Amino acid sequence: MIIVKLGGSVITDKSEYRAFRKDVTARLAREIGSSGKDVIVVHGAGSFGHIVAKENHLQDGLSEEGQIPAAARTMCDTRELSSMVVEEFLAAGIPAVSVPPGSCFVMEDGKLIVGNEETIRRLEGLGIMPVMFGDVVADRGRGFGIVSGDQCMSAKDRKSVV
């Protein structure tokens, strides 16, 4: 199994809020599909995650109630981006589905803790490519935190410590 990272600055224009680079993503999906390899895709949040998260200091965890709507907006936006990425893989003939990190991972005081990866393993077993992404996730100590696409990649094969 190969894990491929699609950088957020590659699939979005990070200078413009929610600017998806459909043509670039479609080309990457075709190239990944033509490789014939079993792949898990992890993508960055780009302009769908970084702008609102940075403006509201979400990376520091919950410090004021006003951050909650921003955390929810960021989660909604990153899921929308992931859906767009998945659509490009489907258009390229690759069965793919978005797997939000919050469904597999939890953080504790800013540190990623690997949780239940059964969903990912079962999708792989069915021949469906999991697509994960950087996102806001629950944090046991801070309320919420930011998990990056890179953290998803490095955590993929670690054993659970939950």
Segment roles from a protein language model:
Residues M1-I40:
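N-terminal glycine-/serine-/threonine-rich phosphate-binding loop
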Residues I3-G7, V42-H43, V99-P100, V131-F133:
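Short beta-strand segments
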Residues V10-T12, G46-I51, C104-M107, V137-D139:
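Short, active-site-adjacent cap segments at secondary-structure transitions
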Residues Y17, G46-L62:
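Glycine-rich loop at the start of a catalytic domain that most often binds anionic cofactors/ligands
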Residues A19-A26, I113-E118, G145-M153:
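Charged helix-capping and loop-helix junction motifs
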Residues H57-V136:
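Ligand-binding beta-strand-loop-alpha-helix segment within the catalytic cores
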Residues M129-V131, V136-R140, F144-D157:
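Conserved mixed alpha/beta catalytic, RNA-binding, or beta-rich assembly cores of soluble enzyme
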Residues K159-V162:
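Conserved small/polar residues in nucleotide/adenosyl-binding loops
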